[in-house]
């Protein structure tokens, strides 16, 4: 999670919401990194998770990320949860809960929805207070 917090901190330059993500291969090596880049690229899909998934798939030469783990500072939104499941990522670790648009158990539980053909194990709240503090520090002067 420390590496994810570091990725998120780099969002300060672009003015993006500070969310960072990494994808770990089955041996625990980082194969993809991402941070929010929506403002930087004017791309509404450039969430940290999607960026990390794209980079991991490129590194592996395969979009099937079977056996990998996605770690992210904020609970994934519905779009990111869909991308995670589409990539066949079996494990998601996140820090702060997203009580407005979370899809890992707060508002929605897309990642564990038994009606879908693929699901992921979810480990929530890892360094959650630290992840939430980073987001609060970003939004405080904007409100």
Summary of predicted features, one role per range:
Residues 38, 72, 96:
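Residues that line or immediately flank small-molecule/substrate-binding pockets and catalytic motifs
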Residues 40-51, 55:
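A short, polar/charged loop-to-alpha-helix boundary motif
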Residues 62-74:
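Immediate flanking context of iron-sulfur cluster ligation sites
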Residues 31-38:
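Short beta->alpha transition motifs characteristic of CBS
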Residues 1-14, 30, 76-143:
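Zinc-dependent deaminase
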Residues 59:
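Conserved catalytic cysteine-centered active-site region
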Residues 19-28:
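Short beta-strand scaffold segments in enzyme catalytic cores
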Residues 4, 8-11, 21, 32, ...:
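Small-residue (primarily alanine) positions within well-ordered alpha-helices
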């Amino acid at each position: 999670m420390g590496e994810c917090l570091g990725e998120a901190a780099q969002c300060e330059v672009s003015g993006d919401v500070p969310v960072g993500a990494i994808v770990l291969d089955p041996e625990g090596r980082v194969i993809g990194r991402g941070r929010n880049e929506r403002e930087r690229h004017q791309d509404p899909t450039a969430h940290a998770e999607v960026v990390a998934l794209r980079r991991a798939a490129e590194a592996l030469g395969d979009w099937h990320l079977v056996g990998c783990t996605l770690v992210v500072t904020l609970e994934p939104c519905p779009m990111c949860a869909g991308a995670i499941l589409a990539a066949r990522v079996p494990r998601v670790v996140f820090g702060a809960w997203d009580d407005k648009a979370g899809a890992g158990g707060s508002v929605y539980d897309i990642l564990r929805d038994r009606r879908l053909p693929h699901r992921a194990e979810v480990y929530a709240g890892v360094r959650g207070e630290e992840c939430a503090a980073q987001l609060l520090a970003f939004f405080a002067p904007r409100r």
